[in-house]
């Protein structure tokens, strides 16, 4: 696993000059999506997708990538505090390997997403959102939080 600083440097060196970036917050039940504007200043929540099966998940994501003319995909990688890969992180990597040939030549990157969901949860609680509403939007907001952090670092 490369460091956050190294990932940002890799993105700076390899991303096309312009174009939308899609961030994916992969969960066991839901997938949160967020995308940047074409100039990469602002991240916006896109959708929360209820996972079904690998084939349907691949189809959904590839359609989103095509529809929004995405130039790069970044998966949040849920790794342990020790830096070791979690079981979910291994699932993310495995799924990305299936997505890669479908969306080629669009590159896929990974970014350490430790604490993103918790940070978003705290913000939603502070905003006094109900538990039900938080559950509906947490995944896409976590993806947005992740992506905005990346955009700010670029």
What residue ranges belong to the model's regions?
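Phosphate- and other anionic-substrate recognition elements at nucleic-acid/protein interfaces
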Residues: 1-22, 29-154
């Amino acid at each position: 696993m490369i460091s956050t600083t190294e990932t940002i440097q890799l993105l700076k060196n390899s991303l096309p000059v312009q174009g939308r970036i899609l961030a994916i917050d992969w969960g066991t039940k839901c997938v949160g999506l967020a995308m940047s504007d074409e100039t990469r200043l602002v991240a916006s929540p896109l959708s929360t997708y209820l996972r079904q099966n690998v084939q349907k998940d691949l189809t959904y994501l590839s359609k989103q990538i095509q529809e929004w003319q995405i130039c790069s995909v970044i998966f949040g990688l849920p790794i342990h505090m020790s830096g070791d890969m979690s079981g979910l992180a291994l699932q993310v990597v495995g799924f990305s390997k299936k997505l890669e040939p479908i969306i080629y030549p669009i590159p896929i990157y990974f970014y350490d997403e430790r604490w993103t969901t918790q940070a978003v949860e705290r913000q939603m609680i502070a905003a006094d959102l109900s538990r039900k509403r938080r559950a509906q939007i947490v995944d896409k907001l976590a993806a947005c939080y992740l992506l905005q952090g990346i955009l700010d670092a670029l």
